[in-house]
Amino acid sequence: MQNSAQAPQKKGSKHFWGFPFTHFTYFFMWQIIFGYLTLWMEQVGHMNGAEAGVVFSAMAGLSLLFQPAFGVISDKLLFKKNLLFTISIAAMLIGPYFQWVFLPLMSINSMLVAIVTGIYLCFIFNGGVSVIEQYVQRASLANGFEYGHSRMGGSLAGMVASFVGGQIFLWQPNSIFWACTISATILTGLLLFSDKVDLENASAAGDTSNSLDLSLIGKIFKLKNFWYLSIFYIGTSAIYDVFDQQFIIFFKSFFNSAAAGTQAYSYMTTAQIGLEFLLMFPMPWIINRIGSRNGLIAYGVILAIRIVGSALSPSLIWVVFLRLLAGFEMPLVLVSIMKYIAGAFDVRVYATVYALASNFAKQISVFIFSAVAGNLYDAIGFHHTYLILGAIVAVVTLFAVFALKKENPVQAGERDESGKAKS
């Protein structure tokens, strides 16, 4: 399967600033929903644990359908915004849905509402996230800017939404959803008027002027490197999510009161997100010099150290220090995976590879690992479970050192035609 997009790229265009705001508006909604939905469903929606579980199960299950489908559609559409507009317009209805549809229907059939809500939110978020991400990455290749610099908008949105969401939830719980509606409206406006792509450089992001047939997509599954990348993501990023799921319980065990532990955790998380935001700016410069494959391996090494270190930490100070390493991990993996897929695969199927290797495989693994890890926490405790999780990450990272092929640095946007690292 030959890589495309070898044509020299023209000088980068000036179109950049709309994309960080696109990232900001989308991930503002993301943080609001995943940060406060559970609390709202309990306090306002009066859902029990089983009903709330159905919402998240539907989101997780249907993501296995939406993610690969959206990947193929995105590769077909390339820079056309049909799917992006569908997602942003659907997000504009979040406020009206939860205010005027969800609550009245809860009194009629609560389980049906839970299923419909899961489908609706999965379409916008679990499926939609890869559509947003791959579009901005492709735009970065065509326009000549760094994806990581745009992604800073998403990191900033996480900090802003965490703070603003808590304040407006206390003021009026339903207002969190109207904040999403406002953000989605701005996102739609950005897609309409601001997010411009230099189509003269479209070949740098995969020229699909010729029909993208299913046989090309089918060849992905015959590539060893695709399976190696999937294994790497399963053994690192899926473990990352599983490790984080109940970390707050482990963290609070170092405190005499749950309230003190919760407050300290919020401060630590804010510091971690702030560090992530700051490191997003220099990370593309770093990855351009070390290579995206090496960036992925560095991510795996740091993650293994953090998980094993947490298990062996003698005091709270070490736990906090190791937790802050996550601020390094996210910029590393977000920038590296985007560049690696662009440089190691045919960019015409960029979105499909991204959706399948880094989202689809990860979702299945998180679903399986979450149950296994939960049982291990109860059976052998956090410390021993963390040692097992850390060992898995270490083994998979070592495997990647020998298995993952080197990317094409020019196609990945790491170096120019002369071989010089981009600044």
Region roles according to the model:
Residues 2-13, 195-230, 256-257, 419, ...:
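Juxtamembrane intracellular "pre-TM" segments in multi-pass secondary transporters
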Residues 7-60, 64, 225-255:
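Helix-loop boundary and gating motifs at the non-cytosolic
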Residues 54-74, 270-282:
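Central cavity-lining transmembrane alpha-helices of secondary-active solute carriers
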Residues 75-89, 288-300:
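Cytoplasmic membrane-interface "Motif A"-like loop-to-helix N-cap segments
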Residues 89-108, 302-314:
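C-terminal ends and interior cores of transmembrane alpha-helices
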Residues 119-154:
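Cytoplasmic helix-loop-helix junction between adjacent transmembrane helices
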Residues 167-184, 375-393:
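A membrane-interface helix-boundary motif in multi-pass transporters
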Residues 348-379:
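A late C-terminal transmembrane helix in Major Facilitator Superfamily
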